[in-house]
Design a protein with these regions (language model features):
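Acidic donor-binding/catalytic loop of UDP-sugar-dependent glycosyltransferases
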Residues: 9-26
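Membrane-embedded multi-pass helical conduit in multi-pass membrane proteins
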Residues: 123, 173-254
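Catalytic donor/gating beta->alpha subdomain of glycosyltransferases that bind UDP-sugars
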Residues: 27-59, 94-98, 103-169, 234, ...
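Loop-to-transmembrane-helix entry motif
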Residues: 66, 70, 170, 174-178
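The conserved acidic donor/metal-binding loop of glycosyltransferases
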Residues: 8-14, 92-94, 106
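Conserved nucleotide-sugar donor-binding
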Residues: 77-90
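Membrane-proximal intrinsically disordered regions of secretory-pathway and membrane-system proteins
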Residues: 257-266
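Short, small-residue-biased leader/transition segments that mark boundaries at the very start
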Residues: 2-7
């Protein structure tokens, strides 16, 4: 039986040769309702300030590969993905992450989201960290919106391993993790006051991590690229913007439009 697929990509990306063939190959499995391609970020020499974006997407891609190896990828990115035409659902107009929600609703119907690193979309990094900040805030807001709209997927008794993957990979990242991360400092300070060596060492390591993040921030301001310092900076930068996503979601409630982040020249 012939199955029709709808393939979607972003206007500012370039697909690799053979990407479409790979997506069609993956979709031949009747258990697959969606095929997620890999997003790759191209970093130009003059875009050292946004090197963390490329590192983040390498990490995210590795997680998606492991998710699919376990059972199913947890959502698809709009840069490149495909769905069975028969499974398409119209999203509400105020949806911020329509590609993510659509793909997971397909998974909730019992289909898998296949992940293929052989089909990828190449995109230039954000022009600078200010543009990357805008992107991260709106994606975080979309993630929070998704947690509510996909709340049925939190039921592990119904969705089993898919629910576990969704909660561990997405829900915790968009809800508890940023709050817990910044609550750790005062908690570790209190524990260190007990005089226990272990707590003192943990506090020192945490402060060192924050210091590296601050140094990464200062170097970013000077457009100096240093991965050792930029990784802790980008990690903290991401979690701060998740918290900012709460206010963004409240401010833009009822609208799914947003200002696109400016990208560097590819």
């Amino acid at each position: 039986r012939q199955r029709q697929m709808c393939i979607r990509d972003s206007a500012n990306t370039m697909l690799n040769k053979g990407a479409i063939k790979e997506i069609i190959r993956q979709s031949s499995d009747p258990r697959v309702g969606c095929v997620a391609g890999e997003k790759r970020v191209e970093i130009q020499a003059e875009q050292g300030a946004t090197a963390g974006e490329g590192i983040y997407w390498k990490y995210e891609s590795a997680l998606k590969r492991l998710d699919y190896r376990l059972y199913s990828a947890v959502g698809a990115a709009g840069e490149l993905f495909a769905i069975r035409t028969s499974l398409f659902e119209q999203m509400p107009p105020d949806t911020l992450l329509d590609d993510f929600i659509l793909s997971l609703r397909i998974a909730m119907k019992g289909y898998k989201i296949a992940y293929s690193k052989e089909a990828y979309a190449l995109e230039s990094a954000s022009l600078n960290m200010r543009e990357e900040e805008k992107r991260k805030v709106r994606i975080s807001a979309g993630g929070l919106q998704s947690v509510w709209r996909l709340r049925g997927l939190l039921n592990m008794f119904r969705y089993g391993i898919l629910s576990f993957q969704y909660i561990s990979h997405r829900v915790l990242r968009w809800t508890l993790t940023p709050i817990i991360l910044f609550a750790l400092l005062p908690l570790n300070l209190l524990l260190a006051c007990t005089g226990h060596t272990l707590y003192t060492v943990i506090l020192a390591l945490q402060l060192a991590f924050y210091l590296l993040g601050y140094l990464g921030y200062k170097m970013e301001k000077r457009n100096i690229r240093n991965k050792l310092l930029f990784i802790p900076y980008y990690f903290l930068f991401m979690n701060i913007n998740v918290i900012r996503g709460y206010s963004y979601l409240a401010k833009h409630k009822g609208t799914g439009s947003w200002e696109k982040a400016k990208r560097g020249a590819g």
